[in-house]
Curated annotation (Swiss-Prot):
One of its GO terms (cellular component) is extracellular region. Lipase activity is inhibited by phenylmethylsulfonyl fluoride (PMSF), but not neostigmine bromide (NB). Lipase that can hydrolyze p-nitrophenyl butyrate and p-nitrophenyl palmitate in vitro. Possesses low activity against p-nitrophenyl acetate. Substrate preference is p-nitrophenyl palmitate > p-nitrophenyl butyrate >> p-nitrophenyl acetate. Lacks cholinesterase activity. It is an enzyme of class 3 (hydrolase). It is found in: Secreted. This is GDSL esterase/lipase At3g26430. Coiled coil: none annotated. GO terms for biological process: lipid catabolic process. Residues 1-25 form the signal peptide. It comes from Arabidopsis thaliana (Mouse-ear cress).
Amino acid sequence: METNLLLVKCVLLASCLIHPRACSPSCNFPAIFNFGDSNSDTGGLSASFGQAPYPNGQTFFHSPSGRFSDGRLIIDFIAEELGLPYLNAFLDSIGSNFSHGANFATAGSTVRPPNATIAQSGVSPISLDVQLVQFSDFITRSQLIRNRGGVFKKLLPKKEYFSQALYTFDIGQNDLTAGLKLNMTSDQIKAYIPDVHDQLSNVIRKVYSKGGRRFWIHNTAPLGCLPYVLDRFPVPASQIDNHGCAIPRNEIARYYNSELKRRVIELRKELSEAAFTYVDIYSIKLTLITQAKKLGFRYPLVACCGHGGKYNFNKLIKCGAKVMIKGKEIVLAKSCNDVSFRVSWDGIHFTETTNSWIFQQINDGAFSDPPLPVKSACTR
């Protein structure tokens, strides 16, 4: 009997080592608080500067949803997996429900503050430090208003949710492309990356000081494989790899990611009560782009929604752009007809199909450190 019990334990242990997801505890996160840029913006920039036009949102929401994609983003799939509603943008005052979290991300956001990057990124003034201010204000005001009772109690999070929530970070890509816009060399961009990580680390420390304990951090994508980077910041043919990606741009991203992982390791030691999950988005997206055909995708370096050129990307005519010709409105940048098979949505962001595939890889735990699914991200 004892021998059989020991055998069962050994089999279970081996199974857990091979498939850690199957043996991981569920954390029952009651809320998500997200910080980021357009990769996870669910309506922040649209609420501030006007809605991202149709065909953004065409696939899932069937109308513009504040997202720069035809449908759902990775953060939406994370919410679904945790059994939570999609996150409303903190800046969106129309019909928002913050009972299970809030999204502080806005498209174009950078880690570094405006005095360092606003002239470079040229899009959003809502950098990560501003998102932190918004979050801090949200903690205080949400509880003051929730205590009024009635409908306010239903629309705002419970106080304890702030210490039990999952805190997600997906930001940094715009800090790197900001350097490209200033014609900086790879070495010049790499030189300011430590400052980017200093400021990101400081924000995480401040969230920790306000009760945050579960952190889910994405690294940055292979920049050299994004259609808009290939179009706007071309490199000589000798610096293009076999898959059509710009080698020096990907080298910048890899350096950023290696340093980010080192910072996460340091934060684990420093903030001993916190659980950190570092997610290797770079490797997942690179796998998808370099093995697109094998995985059932088409034209990984060509935007689905765009206007002309090798990469179907035009910085002056972006997805959904229209013109008036003889009193008639004409859409110049339309969606492709095979969006469910495409990788890139608009040359910058990804399609819903791509985001879904990426999330499946994330949730397997194989690309995360520690190798856990999102439901178990409270594990230290």
